[in-house]
């Protein structure tokens, strides 16, 4: 299990707000053989956590990302993976820069290190230059996950637009009655909105059958992306984070928990919709330039069955993974 971390913020970074813990002096630990506190105090000595550079080597590491947003991003990614899969062994692969070329190298390094699941909490607007690095995200035998973005319905995000990548959108949870105890809708608030889009570069894969997008549609699946508390010392303690940078590592962790990482990809989700909660409410129309319109189409509005903001739905156990 790996998460890639550039050293400065691009599009899909988690957005932080101050949050007060009811018991800030008591770090929370997760059950399982590989335990981390919410501030990631798991050490390399345990064998459960390590970090390497974009070549997969323990040194030299890039300069600290403190103050750039990526210190929080790394905390968030590792915390969400370990929440979903407490026994997963985690490797953070650090890129030298937030450019497409450096980021592409991190996935290759993760694959060479034997990671079964690779989580990418970043994205950029798709274009020809970004797509020139697509081969770096094609690794048979490895499940690759990427966040769909935090600015709602717009141009598809790279690398989430690739057919080899599980694209993850975002939802909001609220307390409700009933057996589940929650109601769920598309994430869209004053901080941002889960990404969705229709690729102008990547062909429609055979396993996607939505009708209003001729290319690859983002997203495939989704998870909670709002109001998640994380402890980060460089931010002075507990903060509340929003973004599909929450959702992507959660989904990656669920793949790790299921134990099928490396043998499944985005296409397998479409054959296991009964193991997903269908999200049917909400829109991700957040920031749309004049050239981008959606109306009430499934590309930006949740509805029964597949829709782009939440994909096929959110995990109901591990059956789809």
Annotated model-derived regions:
Residues 1-170, 192-242, 248, 259-265, ...:
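Substrate-binding/charge-relay-adjacent region of secreted/lumenal peptidase catalytic domains
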Residues 100, 174-180:
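Short acidic, Gly/Pro-enriched loop/turn segments at secondary-structure junctions
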Residues 118, 184, 195-198, 273-274, ...:
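Intrinsically disordered, low-complexity segments enriched in Ser/Pro/Gly/Ala and basic residues
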Residues 178-194:
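Phosphate/diphosphate-binding glycine-rich loops and adjacent basic-rich segments that engage nucleotide
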Residues 189-191, 198, 205, 283-294:
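Secretory-pathway extracellular proteins and peptide precursors enriched for disulfide-bonded cysteines
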Residues 254:
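Walker A/P-loop NTP-binding active-site region of P-loop NTPases
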Residues 259-308, 312:
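An often Trp-containing, charged/polar helix-loop segment at the C-terminal end
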């Amino acid at each position: 299990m790996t998460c890639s971390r550039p050293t400065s913020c691009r599009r899909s970074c988690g957005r932080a707000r101050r949050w007060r813990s009811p018991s800030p002096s008591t770090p929370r630990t997760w059950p399982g053989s590989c335990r981390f506190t919410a501030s990631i105090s798991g050490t390399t000595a345990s064998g459960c956590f390590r970090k390497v550079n974009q070549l997969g080597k323990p040194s030299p590491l890039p300069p600290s990302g403190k103050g750039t947003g990526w210190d929080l991003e790394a905390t968030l990614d590792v915390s969400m993976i370990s929440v979903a899969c407490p026994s997963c062994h985690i490797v953070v692969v650090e890129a030298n820069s937030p450019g497409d070329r450096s980021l592409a190298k991190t996935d290759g390094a993760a694959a060479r290190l034997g990671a079964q699941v690779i989580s990418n909490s970043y994205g950029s607007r798709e274009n020809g230059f970004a797509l020139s690095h697509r081969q770096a995200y094609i690794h048979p035998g490895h499940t690759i996950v990427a966040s769909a973005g935090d600015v709602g319905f717009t141009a598809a995000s790279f690398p989430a637009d690739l057919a080899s990548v599980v694209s993850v959108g975002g939802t909001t949870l609220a307390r409700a009655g009933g057996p589940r105890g929650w109601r769920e809708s598309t994430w869209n608030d004053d901080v941002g909105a889960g990404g969705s889009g229709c690729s102008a570069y990547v062909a429609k894969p055979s396993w996607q059958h939505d009708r209003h997008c001729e290319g690859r549609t983002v997203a495939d699946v989704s998870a909670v992306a709002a109001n998640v508390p994380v402890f980060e010392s460089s931010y002075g303690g507990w903060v509340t984070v929003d973004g599909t940078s929450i959702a992507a590592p959660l989904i990656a962790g669920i793949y790790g928990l299921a134990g099928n990482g490396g043998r499944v990809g985005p296409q397998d989700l479409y054959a296991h919709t009964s193991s997903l909660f269908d999200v049917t409410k909400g829109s991700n129309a957040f920031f749309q330039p004049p050239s981008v319109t959606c109306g009430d189409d499934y590309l930006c509005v949740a509805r029964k069955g597949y829709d782009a903001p939440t994909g096929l739905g959110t995990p109901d156990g591990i059956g789809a993974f």
